[in-house]
Regions:
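Alpha-helical transmembrane segments and their helix-entry boundary regions
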Residues: 65-69, 101, 132, 162
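Small-polar-interrupted transmembrane alpha-helices in polytopic inner-membrane proteins
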Residues: 25-29, 65-80, 147
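Interfacial helix-loop-helix junctions of multi-pass membrane proteins
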Residues: 80-86, 150-164
Length: 193
């Protein structure tokens, strides 16, 4: 007697793969949050999170790159220790780092949209260095625009003080993160994995 079974795909293979990649990059940003350095001229520490934001946008594109950072924020808000130095909870999303955190999905989407010239992923070998660097500079502007606004709101800082403490103080570190991201993209390490 033959048994007839039918299977129903609730989620396509491509969607499942993209969701898994988004979760992986959310975890990467969370791991990078543990790498912190005090910044003597800012109330906010330097972390490697922004490097993860750049990489999410570059490798996943604007849609899934942004989604990965929404997943990251949700995990942290629900108690996963993925924010700066292993902190967690919704309070982080309304505290002094709130502007930076809320900017991450937008910045990843912007970086991905510039690198891929839209929502469809393209071969990263065809992306020129000026486009790659320009996308990350634009992502940095988004992150520090949100971050400065958050510092002004939460800490009642004036615009000049907020820009000095919330953006200018981080520019050397951001240049290094951009260089690191270029190194990762231009190496064949990710493609080989």
């Amino acid at each position: 007697m033959a048994t007839n079974t039918e299977s129903v795909d609730l989620v396509g293979d491509e969607a499942a793969t993209n969701l898994a990649r988004a979760a992986l990059f959310a975890a990467l940003v969370g791991a990078f949050a543990y790498v912190t350095f005090p910044n003597p001229v800012s109330p906010v520490d330097v972390t490697l999170q922004v490097l993860g934001v750049f990489l999410a946008g570059i490798f996943l594109g604007p849609v899934w790159g942004g989604a990965s950072l929404v997943l990251y924020l949700a995990a942290g808000a629900l108690g996963a220790p993925v924010f700066e130095g292993g902190s967690a909870g919704f309070g982080q999303l309304v505290g002094q780092t709130a502007g930076y955190l809320w900017s991450y999905p937008v910045a990843a989407a912007v970086v991905g949209a510039v690198v891929h010239r839209g929502a469809t992923l393209r071969d990263l070998d065809s992306v020129g260095l000026p486009t790659l660097v320009g996308a990350m500079v634009l992502g940095t502007v988004v992150i520090y625009g949100f971050g400065v606004a958050g510092l002004m709101l939460v800490l009642s800082l004036g615009p000049i003080e907020a820009i000095a403490a919330g953006a200018a103080a981080f520019l050397p570190a951001e240049a290094l993160k951009i260089a690191a991201a270029v190194g990762v993209v231009r190496s064949d390490a990710i493609a080989a994995a």
